[in-house]
């Protein structure tokens, strides 16, 4: 039920929620050419980013952190908690990343099992998703 006194707050909430997006950037740990990746990423990133969400690993995750700094955007990192989840920690971390994001931008390579896991989770949650092969 929306009461007339709450309409302004609701409109503000909806405009913030859909105009500003938390974008998850996930991908291969073997990526090594930041400048080439940055050119690709800047060509596909939405303009209305409020935050970058990533996993704190090497490769694309490190690129995402660097790009967030260069763009002056906040970075939210979910690192795997091996003490709590053991070998399944990266998959739990992927769930946390996807849950926190409005939009998922994935950069898989041939061996990107974790990236494909995040892609599957984003699809299952009907998240906005863009997959760019490296």
Short names for language-model regions:
Residues 4-5, 15:
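Serine residues within intrinsically disordered or low-complexity segments
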Residues 22, 29-134:
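Acidic/glycine-enriched connector segments
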Residues 14-18, 71:
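Generic low-complexity, intrinsically disordered sequence content enriched
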